[in-house]
Amino acid sequence: MTPSTIQIIAAALFFIAIAHTFATRFFERLAHKNPRHAGIWHLLGEVEIVFGFWAMVLVLLMFAIQGSEEATKYIDTRNFTEPLFVFTVMVMSGTRPILQTATALVAATAKLLHLPGSSGSYLAVLILAPLLGSFITEPAAMTLAAMLLGQQFLSREVSEKFKYATLGVLFVNVSIGGTLTNFAAPPVLMVATPWQWDMGFMLTHFGWKAALAVCVNAIGVTVLFRKELVNLPPAPASSSKPVPAPLIAANILLLAGVVVFAHHPAIFLGMFLLFLGLSSAYIRHSDRLILREALLVAFFLAGLVVLGGLQQWWLQPVLLQMNSNQVFFGATILTAFTDNAALTYLGSLVSGLSDEFKYALVAGAVTGGGLTVIANAPNPAGMAILRPHFKYGAVKPLGLLMAALPATIVAGLAFLLL
């Protein structure tokens, strides 16, 4: 396949955007050195801005080279349902009624575990939230887990190593934890219909292996940082008044409705507007809605949709050159530099793939979903919520990569050997 000029430009901008994600701290330093233009440098230093910014550059170049008709046609044919859904579910999952319910569930589980200090709560969050993602979707699970981990652990006196290890395990566990069903994990969703993978297939081929890996990863990081967790007393109870049960039920029903109609933006956005009205009517039972963070994440994902739509010309041949044994490792590595749903989507376009190839492609894609912020669609949501708790308000990409590597290896072994 001979690439067009725009495809070559899009590939170049895509790799520039990837490099930009590794250089956000450079822009933060520029903001301190050059206060006159600190605003623009701070903007470019936001990880969530990166892909949206370079997608805008691509669209401007498309207007200049191809004309307005072709440029607008390309944008109109992109599917922005996922960014809209992630925005909606982030805001709705981060509310006081939902968080109080999740906190109560974690506290009840921690009591059953009988572990010292904060170990029980920590272990419960890293196991329950990712597995719950198979039913409430991964973005909702990521938002809940990140909010709980931020409030109860990362905002307190803990080491940077602990913070990176927590983020790495969270990203990997959420990526693999959504594979118990065929609708919650974006890379699975892309292939479930064309490959006829139902919930029974997912549970028997992926789900139990993923659940085992999630538990091993969570237990491993808990044991590794047991001294910090044992010395960390349980987080103090929230000073907020308990939310009335009818309001909790209304919030849960609206969130469930959004999840059920996740592929119908006209419906779930209508539910979101109703949720905003409800939050405004009962503002005394609401905390600040995370609208800014959710909008940044949606901008990031929308940019990924625009840039990613022109990468098929080089990505698909790379995948098809591999056999079923090689594609697992290839998909795991490629996922770190692309979106894992994009990888599996490209695989779904190819006919005649063996069952072994299909399994290896999806298993590799979800295994590598925690290595970088762009590897899995929910990762930017977790990053936006937890990043302020890290030193200088920034997460080092290499630090995240190294922190996620052990959990990634555990997940890979589970999918390959079990």
Where are these regions (language model features)?
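Interfacial loop-to-helix junctions that mark the boundaries of transmembrane helices
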Residues: 1-8, 40-48, 69-83, 199-209, ...
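Flexible interhelical linker loops that connect adjacent transmembrane helices
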Residues: 38, 224-248, 283-292
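Transmembrane alpha-helix boundary signature
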Residues: 59-75, 89-108, 131-143, 309-317
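Transmembrane helical segments that form the transport core of multi-pass membrane transport proteins
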Residues: 65-68, 72-73, 99, 250-355
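Helix-loop-helix module between adjacent transmembrane segments
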Residues: 90-96, 116-117, 128-140, 172-181, ...
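Hydrophobic transmembrane alpha-helices that form the pore/transport pathway of multi-pass ion
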Residues: 114, 120-176, 190, 345-363, ...
